[in-house]
């Protein structure tokens, strides 16, 4: 197996732990505060590490705009929406709904990269969207039950998955011209700058964060391992592996994340949640198979 594939496998297994860790930390601190802490820690690690490359990089005006956009979309929006959604949903649902990201990669690639969408890919994306809807509704309205209490959180998590997909697509052209470490450092720095107003607003209007030992340890893990190292490795893989193939490995996250939510947090998976997850995986398999044939 190529080295990049092994790295993708391991990195997605690590990313799968983030849902349960974040769910625990969010019991003590607010969503924007956690996102700000992750981005601040990531910036403090990556910027000094990548400083020589950042100074030496000959970035065009388009590169600067893309890096700013990747920071705002892929870090500020994705992190904030992910945390807010997770605070009002479950770690298991968050893990399953991340499969919206690869489907979004297929849907957004024609818009952002000029790639054509085949009928099979469109059908696969539709199945993935249907699966996400089944998870959000968790049944048939009027037949089984009304929308579950955390449906709003699930919808926000879907938007977070779309933001993550947009990040990968926006960043890829820059990654083909500049080192992954430089792109990651710039992006996270922009994300931290854009997140600061949201964090300040949360501090001013909400309860103060409670920095319990588990909140500190969890935040450090999310900042160092998941953000700084995780995204540096992720961008390294994006340099070497085509986006549709990267999407295949994202399937590891819902399985690992959902199992951790059940085992670690005692969450329950309903039949509709499992069915929705299977629909998403079936849709993703269809789109990837179509892309391979194309």
Identify the role of each PLM range.
Residues 25, 34, 38, 85, ...:
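Hydrophobic/aromatic residues within transmembrane alpha-helices
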Residues 35-37, 91-102, 170-193, 223-263:
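Helix-helix packing/entry segments at the starts of transmembrane helices
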Residues 59-66, 95-98, 114-134, 138, ...:
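Loop-to-transmembrane alpha-helix entry segments
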Residues 1-36, 143-173, 193-197:
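Glycine-/small-residue-enriched transmembrane alpha-helix faces in small-molecule transporters
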Residues 28-77, 104, 108, 162-170, ...:
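Transmembrane alpha-helices of multi-pass small-molecule transport proteins
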Residues 14, 18-19, 47-98, 108, ...:
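Specific transmembrane alpha-helical segments of multi-pass solute transporters/efflux pumps
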Residues 12-16, 70-79, 102, 136, ...:
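Transmembrane alpha-helical core positions of polytopic small-molecule transporters
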Residues 6, 18, 41-45, 97-111, ...:
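Alpha-helical transmembrane segments of compact multi-pass small-molecule transporters, enriched
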